[in-house]
Amino acid sequence: MSDLTGSGDTFRTNAMLDNVLVAYGANCDKRAALYTNGRDIRDPMLSPLFGDMHGFPPTILTSGTRDLLLSNTVRVHRKLRQAGVEAVLQVFEGQSHAQYYRDVNAPETREAFEEIASFFDRHLGK
């Protein structure tokens, strides 16, 4: 989670469309409160979107058009690029949060993992 404030557009537009996270509401708020343990939810150590992205390593981000966190993923991608970090964003049509890994036979799963493997091969070597 890159932004615990719930300020991303898709927290609203994809509510009830994301069949994994469903909606950012009371349950997520309670989990966020537990996770933050009283700290400011805008603290970059908790919500990296509010931090400095300079010096980050090359990054690959994966989301779906129905992902509750899609807008946050897009915002992180833009912030990484603005900081001069090589960043790749893959977005899969009709996919909910992390749905690409739930069905090993889905074409999106194969494509996601092929792209991720290729990204790691390029940056970490074979």
Functional labels for PLM-detected ranges:
Residues 1-126:
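Alpha/beta-hydrolase superfamily serine-hydrolase fold, recognizing
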